[in-house]
Amino acid sequence: MNLAIIGYGKMGKTIEQVALDRGHTVVARIDNPNFTPAEIAHADVAIEFTQPDSAKENILKCFEANIPVAVGTTAWYEDYDAVAEIAKAEGKALFTATNFSIGVNILFHLNKQLAAVMNNFDEYNVTMTETHHLEKKDHPSGTAVTLAEGILAQLDRKKKYIGLLKGQSADISAFDLHIESKREPNVPGDHTITYSSEIDDITIRHTAKSRMGFAKGAVIAAEWLIGKKGVFGMNDLLNF
């Protein structure tokens, strides 16, 4: 496939490496937010990894260029419903994921199942920690938010999540799911969910060893998206 990469930072360069290794051609490398749809129109599909304030405009440029787009940018989801409606109404293809890693999406699946089981055991309190590299600006991470939403959907005793950077404090009630965010050098991503009681802990965790898992998942999603119309996510790709 002919691929346009929108966002040519560390992740974009890793995506390029994976795409080339899988026999694809990168026909556009976009690192300027003022690019035009014409610059990507010759691609079969685009992968977008930029910043939250650029994502919506970048997606709409892909729609204007009439190419499918797989979006890995997070923290732009206040615009998601409007963008998804445009995709459906105009017959475009939009694939979004808070995390393209296959392993993380397995964690999403296990997380929901565990929360459903733990709904019957009130003696356990659930908390979450997420750690990323210093360059990651948003917190909690999109992955942590997806995990939190999975827990809240299954665990009746938690009503909302509260995300705090390490060292921050806030009033956290028994009804709140506390997410602690840490920013440390050279950490691609680590997410841990712990159910703790007076007698034991139950923990599930995903630790990324590099950006390669995210990049490979994004390229696989882009391959899958070609020729489709509509709005999709990792559950569609993985048949969860």
Describe each region flagged by the PLM.
Residues 68, 83-101, 118-124, 128:
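Rossmann-fold dehydrogenase core element
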Residues 40-47, 63-68:
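Short acidic/histidine-rich motifs immediately flanking catalytic phosphotransfer sites
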Residues 50-51, 74, 183:
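Short glycine-/small-residue-rich Rossmann-like dinucleotide-binding loops
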